[in-house]
Amino acid sequence: VAHFRNITLEVGKGVFVPRPETEWVTGLAIDAVKACATAEPIVFDLCAGSGAIGLAIATEIPNAQVIGVEKSADAFGYTSRNYEKLAPTNGRAILADVADTPNDLDGKVDVVISNPPYIPAQMVPIYPEVALHDPGLALYGGEDGLDVVRVVADVAARLLHPGGTLIIEHADMQGEAVRHLLLDKGWTQVRTHQDFNSRDRSVSAIRSH
């Protein structure tokens, strides 16, 4: 099992074990959801893994409707079981590639959050337990580490309503690159956020009107 904010998750082989930095990024998403004007905010967690981020939101904000999307069949076993256990009424898990996220809620979503694979292909993770135990599919994001980030940004642009919030976790050396990526795609209010170690750890952006 893994403890994450106020929840306990089932994890095992084939699923990424959530890190403390992601708890902090999740806090940003929770603040964004709480700021929503809608009575039942809709939240997507893309690249959901164990479901940690989405389920923390679903349990801390019971009026939110949370959908987790995960492409790995191995990981999805944990995603679906954790959703059934922790958010049976206000959460659901979907087995799909991010690019194939269902379109039935396009333009209606309030917040999209993602902790995508973002490690450049040549980099060896600094944490031995990551290199040895976490699945490569959850870690590596292509040559510059941003392949999946680009897809997440495009999918979020169709999911979110104008004024909706996107939050993406990234590596500490990717802050500027992710900012420019989102600005080039037309996102507004693009901001880098530093974690508890004062390292660039995530970006937030608003879908323009």
Report each predicted region and the residues it spans.
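Conserved AdoMet
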Residues: V1-A32
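Conserved Class I SAM-dependent methyltransferase catalytic core
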Residues: E143-I206
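Conserved SAM/SAH cofactor-binding pocket of Class I
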Residues: E23-Y127
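Generic C-terminal helix-cap and adjacent flexible tail
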Residues: K34-C36, T188, R207-H209
